[in-house]
Regions:
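Rieske [2Fe-2S] iron-sulfur-binding subdomain
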Residues: 1-58, 74, 92-172
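Local cysteine-cluster metal-coordination motifs and their immediate loop/turn environment
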Residues: 60-74, 80-93
Length: 172
């Protein structure tokens, strides 16, 4: 006989699939003003992500996980084109490649792409990320409605955080 507590903790692959969202689409993940000099940690479609701007103002997005010990990169430092982990200072660039491991000379991690990166577009006051699957890593063009990008229209970004499944938010 199975107790209710054991039954409730079973893995549900369908629920996990639904929580990860519809893949191969651009999603607005943050307003542009939210990402400035310090790295910002967000969770979207069940994925933890770090966002930061480089020295030219371009936004980068990586999985929020240091390849060395799994610490959150969003708690680290913005070095311009890369972010440094707060734990041991591992430097990871916007492509997910480890640039430097300060504590280990000639570390085998250096020059290796160890962290998932996301294609980023910044348009209409929002930061969009491409959530592609393994079969579609290259993003489709991000084509927004003319009302959001043309100068003859006024627009503003309205943001609200809902603690719910993305499916309910899309419907409303």
């Amino acid at each position: 006989m199975t107790s209710p507590a054991q039954h409730a903790s079973q893995h549900d692959p369908v629920r996990d699939y639904l929580d990860r969202g519809i893949k191969n689409y651009w999603y607005p993940v943050a307003p542009s003003w939210q990402v400035s000099n310090a790295p910002v940690g967000i969770t979207r479609l069940s994925e933890q992500i770090v966002l930061w701007r480089d020295q030219d103002g371009k936004v980068h997005a990586l999985e929020d996980r240091c390849p060395h010990r799994g610490a959150r990169l969003s708690l680290g430092w913005n070095l311009g084109g890369s972010v440094a982990c707060w734990y041991h200072g591992i430097e990871v660039d916007g492509s997910g490649t480890v640039n430097k491991v300060p504590a280990v000379a000639n570390c085998p991690l250096e020059g290796t792409k160890c962290v998932k990166s996301y294609p980023v577009e910044e348009k209409a006051g929002a930061i969009f990320l491409w959530f592609g699957d393994d079969a579609h890593p290259e993003p489709a063009p991000l084509n927004l409605p003319v009302e959001l990008v043309a100068d003859e229209y006024a627009h503003f970004l309205c943001m609200s955080n809902w603690k719910c499944n993305y499916q309910y938010a899309i419907d409303n």
